[in-house]
UniProtKB/Swiss-Prot annotation:
It is an enzyme of class 3 (hydrolase). The gene is lspA. GO terms for molecular function: aspartic-type endopeptidase activity. The chain crosses the membrane at residues 12-32, 67-87, 94-116, 137-157. This is Lipoprotein signal peptidase. PANTHER family: LIPOPROTEIN SIGNAL PEPTIDASE (PTHR33695:SF1). This protein specifically catalyzes the removal of signal peptides from prolipoproteins. Belongs to the peptidase A8 family. Pathway: Protein modification; lipoprotein biosynthesis (signal peptide cleavage). GO terms for cellular component: plasma membrane. InterPro entries: Peptidase_A8 (IPR001872). It holds the Pfam family Peptidase_A8. It is found in: Cell inner membrane.
Length: 176
């Protein structure tokens, strides 16, 4: 574990702030300029559509009666705390994992503020093709998904590199 926070993954915390600010500013813009369910086509497959999500990703548990607001609040605080602790333990050079953790934290905190302030998450990025629609989402959701993908990619690359090192060590041992 790095002895100084400046040598740890916490050096990447600026990304949390960047994601959080971009997410909150975009949502404030939507709230100021759109009526609920109002939609503006930007491209033949992409709209800004203001929707309220009372659940999680893909509106999971959106009709659960209200308890989910506090459940997802607890989950966001818990994961953000855990990932921040892990960032403190990571060397700052582990950029892929540090970036992944900060993207997830920034997204979780962005949606957390919505839940606490409004009781729902503001979604507005709406992709579709003909009659097939992908559920609307926001910048925080995107950051969480990209962060999760980076965690998976990092684990695959780390496992591959570990296997290469082990094979190299076995080769060197066999030559002696």
């Amino acid at each position: 574990m790095p002895t100084n926070w400046k040598d740890s993954g916490l050096r990447w915390y600026w990304m949390v702030v960047l994601v959080f600010i971009a997410d909150q500013l975009s949502k404030q813009w939507v709230l100021a300029n759109f009526e609920l369910r109002e939609s503006v086509e930007l491209l033949p497959f992409f709209n800004f559509t203001y929707l309220r999500n009372y659940g999680a990703a893909f509106s999971f548990l959106s009709d659960a009666g209200g308890w989910q607001r506090w459940f997802f609040t607890f989950v966001a605080v818990g994961f953000s705390t855990l990932l921040t602790i892990w960032l403190r333990k990571q060397p700052r050079q582990m950029w892929r994992l540090n970036l992944a953790y900060t993207l997830v934290i920034g997204g979780a905190l962005g949606n957390l503020i919505d839940r606490l302030q409004h009781g729902y998450v503001v979604d507005f990025l709406h992709f579709y093709w003909n009659t097939s629609h992908f559920p609307a989402f926001n910048i925080a959701d995107s950051a969480i998904c990209v962060g999760a993908a980076l965690i998976i990619i990092d684990s695959i690359i780390t496992e591959r590199d570990d296997k290469k090192k082990k094979a190299q060590e076995n080769n060197n041992t066999a030559k002696e």
